[in-house]
Amino acid sequence: MSDFEVPPKAKGFKRLFKALFYSKDGLKCAWIEESAFRQIVILALFCIVLASYLAKDFLEWGLLILPCFLSVVVELINSSIEKAVDFTGTEFHPLAKKAKDMASAAQLIGLIFWTLIWGRYLLALYLK
């Protein structure tokens, strides 16, 4: 048996409060350790501000910021998969490479979605 004991799980609002701080720690870790996360967040903030200026109504604004949030979420998942794979060992393994590559591909698809939505929207504004 190890010296480390898992504390009993909190319930109710205390659990939600603890979860909020775990999430804050995760965001802080991603911001400090992952340059790709910082780049995605800065681009997302820029696009959210731009969408607030360009969108004609709430629905249009929501559709413009959707790919921004999606890419931030996918980058968090991508980074967590990379951290978990790196934690399991330092040796190269083909399955570890596949896991990292698939997580990266998910982010690529999110960024393509972002580009398609914004590209189509800005093109329509330009051609008006």
Swiss-Prot record:
It comes from Helicobacter pylori (strain ATCC 700392 / 26695) (Campylobacter pylori). It comes from the Bacteria. The chain crosses the membrane at residues 35-55, 58-78, 107-127. InterPro entries: DAGK, DAGK_prok, DAGK_sf. Belongs to the bacterial diacylglycerol kinase family. Pfam families: DAGK_prokar. Its EC number is 2.7.1.107. One of its GO terms (biological process) is phosphatidic acid biosynthetic process. The keyword Transmembrane applies. GO terms for molecular function: ATP binding; ATP-dependent diacylglycerol kinase activity; lipid kinase activity; metal ion binding. Keywords: ATP-binding, Cell inner membrane, Cell membrane, Kinase, Lipid biosynthesis, Lipid metabolism, Magnesium, Membrane, Metal-binding, Nucleotide-binding, Phospholipid biosynthesis, Phospholipid metabolism, Transferase, Transmembrane, Transmembrane helix. This is Diacylglycerol kinase. PROSITE patterns: DAGK_PROKAR. Gene3D superfamilies: 1.10.287.3610. It catalyses: a 1,2-diacyl-sn-glycerol + ATP = a 1,2-diacyl-sn-glycero-3-phosphate + ADP + H(+). Catalyzes the ATP-dependent phosphorylation of sn-l,2-diacylglycerol (DAG) to phosphatidic acid. Involved in the recycling of diacylglycerol produced as a by-product during membrane-derived oligosaccharide (MDO) biosynthesis. It is a multi-pass membrane protein.
